[in-house]
Amino acid sequence: MAGPAAAFRRLGALSGAAALGFASYGAHGAQFPDAYGKELFDKANKHHFLHSLALLGVPHCRKPLWAGLLLASGTTLFCTSFYYQALSGDPSIQTLAPAGGTLLLLGWLALAL
């Protein structure tokens, strides 16, 4: 397993470690502006974990570069918009979430190829 496939496996592992770090921060250190912020943070974290696992499967599909790029960029856009809004209370970048979600959907479909 070499090239982009191995890189996405490593990225999935690093992303999973980051998701665990965010989960710990959300549970023990974060100060949320309101209850909705905590809900958004938990939603982002759940998706962060799930799509980190999906990245680990990228080396086993026929189009690892496509699947990996779609999943990685989708996870970044989707989760970042929710993490940011949850911690700051500022919804200004929430418009990135639908774009990220679309990329995630396409990434899952690319895994099926």
UniProtKB/Swiss-Prot annotation:
Which residues are on the Cytoplasmic side of the membrane?
Answer: 85-92
UniProt keyword list: Acetylation, Membrane, Signal, Transmembrane, Transmembrane helix
Q: Which domain of life is it from?
A: Eukaryota
Query: What residue ranges are annotated as transmembrane?
Result: 64-84, 93-113
Q: How does it sit in the membrane?
A: Multi-pass membrane protein
What start and end residues bound the annotated signal peptide?
Answer: 1-29
Q: What is this protein called?
A: Transmembrane protein 256
Organism expressing this protein natively: Homo sapiens (Human)
Gene name, Swiss-Prot/TrEMBL: TMEM256
